[in-house]
Amino acid sequence: MIYNEQKGDLFDLDEKFALAHCISADTNNPKSWGLGIVKEFRKRFPYIKEYVDLTMEKNDLTYPCVIIHYVSNNNSIKDDRVIFNLVTKAKYYSKPTYSTITKCIKEMACLCKSMNIKYLGMPKIGCGLDKLNWDKVKQIIKREFKDLDIQIEVRYLL
């Protein structure tokens, strides 16, 4: 694993990077997509909310889990960008725990391995509005991805 963390816009990463962010399980609540970086994901990927809503409902999913969304770059599945939606909490106003974020990160690492994803970008997941300690979350990420052939880029604005 190659790990890099720096100030910058997550969405400036090359499109070869899969992206990850945290969401709540109450995705059908309009407020659940209205704050933080999740709002920016919805703005940049307009169909993400509807896809996640449908996936949660159709599969009767509960948190913690990871929902994969593909964003088509040019109508070719092999060129689709992968977005990992880490469902780390029940309600948009609640907070995740280290247990739920660990389960999601572990699942995402397994998915990256099975999908042969070599590039992953993310914000400081669970640490903005969700208030988890970044040093702890970073250690979870490094532990779960340590044996993978992947480059992880973390971006933050503040």
Protein language model features and the residues they cover:
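Macrodomain-like recognition of ADP-ribose-binding/processing modules
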Residues: 1-158
